[in-house]
Amino acid sequence: MPNAISQVRREIKHTGSMKAKIVILLYRLATMYRSRNPFYKLLGIPFVILNKLINECLFCVELPWQTRIGYGLRLYHPHCIVLNRGTVIGENCILRQGATIGSLTDSEGREGASPVIGNNVEFGAHVVVIGPVTLGDNVKIGAGTVVTKDLAAGQVVVGQPFRVLSTHREV
């Protein structure tokens, strides 16, 4: 737990606006509800409620406590961001306003698989990532792009339907 506290402190320090700091802090505190430790689980209950009330109702940012997000998350202009509870996001990712990351439902209303996103992925404004897709590490997605297929590590994509602009490799 001390390691998690220092990571959250570092994460909040490197996030820009006060609104983004509040959103991330409430989300991280709400994730205590996932703990197997009964004390942390109990401690997480009020933060699950605050996450719902403040982040979703007041700030229009849906980061469910079930969503798995690595440390280093940065939110630029955190408004109208929607993440599905089954989504998995790696470390050091950037989300901008209007980002939607979620699953598809079938004709009977059953929820399908959610996206799995690597480390150091950057989302432009109003990006939509939908369905059982995997985004590799160091992917960059341009504003307004809809992603419905897997992206390899290092790809830069834009447009609808998206097209790959380049593939960069980590040096």
Question: Where on the chain are the PLM-derived regions?
Answer:
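Terminal amphipathic alpha-helical/low-complexity segments used for targeting or macromolecular assembly
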Residues: M1-F59, V171
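Left-handed beta-helix
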Residues: W65, G70-Y71, Y76-H79, N84-R85, ...
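Short beta-strand-to-coil "C-cap" segments at the C-terminal boundary of structured domains/repeats
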Residues: S166-E170
